Amino acid sequence: MNVRRVESISAQLEEASSTGGFLYTQNSTKRSIKERLMKLLPCSAAKTSSPAVQNSVEDELEMATVRHRPEALELLEAQSKFTKKELQILYRGFKNECPSGVVNEDTFKEIYSQFFPQGDSTTYAHFLFNAFDTDHNGAVSFEDFIKGLSILLRGTVQEKLNWAFNLYDINKDGYITKEEMLDIMKAIYDMMGKCTYPVLKEDAPRQHVETFFQKMDKNKDGVVTIDEFIESCQKDENIMRSMQLFENVI
């Protein structure tokens, strides 16, 4: 597997999901995030493609021979916040990595693990995969990828928070329980490994969850609704500042 091509997609997902998962590190500066995010879309600006290559990409998009046929480019452009040219570039990279036209969970986990060798990203990648797999068919298509990426990179704060809520709502019942949030937090800590908590206690994820629930569970009924989640996040300066990073870099 071509690591450079994998990095162009996976780094986007890692940074974006980290924001949605309220993962903060001292090194998460605007510059470092920008450098990683720019690897996917604007990378094409540094390389001048010949007309023949550009036409080839267009032909691939409209006459794909892969097992999964993508939706028409015009439809995806209308459903996302990417331009036609950006979609062409994204599809070209997606197809190079996934000739079948879809990514299954095992491949997704393999890609994700390459960026967290210091930890175990398996569980978090599972949750993230399910968030992208909106129709729950066990595969992430190019359409799934684009719609999720469009929200994470160019969506409104409301759209990003809705996406984050869906990530935490593991069983998709419309509520976040402490157990669900704890599962996500443990997965994040496991993924970051020693880089995140060399001196923290084992119960750090649980303490993190307790703090969040004190803020979010307004009526103290033991679950967090989408309204409680969004309201609490919008009042949290750290979360909102993290969201704004993406608005400034793309």
Swiss-Prot record:
Ca(2+) 1 binds at residues 133, 135, 137, 144. Residues 237-250 are annotated as: Interaction with KCND2. One of its GO terms (molecular function) is potassium channel regulator activity. GO terms for cellular component: peroxisome; voltage-gated potassium channel complex. It is found in: Cell membrane; Cytoplasm; Peroxisome. GO terms for biological process: regulation of potassium ion transmembrane transport; regulation of signal transduction. InterPro entries: EF-hand-dom_pair (IPR011992), EF_Hand_1_Ca_BS (IPR018247), EF_hand_dom (IPR002048), Recoverin (IPR028846). SUPFAM superfamilies: EF-hand (SSF47473). The modification Phosphoserine is found at residues 17, 56. The KIS (K-channel inactivation suppressor) domain is required for converting A-type Kv4 current to a slowly inactivating delayed rectifier potassium current. Regulatory subunit of Kv4/D (Shal)-type voltage-gated rapidly inactivating A-type potassium channels. Modulates KCND2 channel density, inactivation kinetics and rate of recovery from inactivation in a calcium-dependent and isoform-specific manner. Modulates KCND3/Kv4.3 currents. Isoform 4 does not increase KCND2 expression at the cell membrane. Isoform 4 retains KCND3 in the endoplasmic reticulum and negatively regulates its expression at the cell membrane. This is Kv channel-interacting protein 4. The gene is KCNIP4.
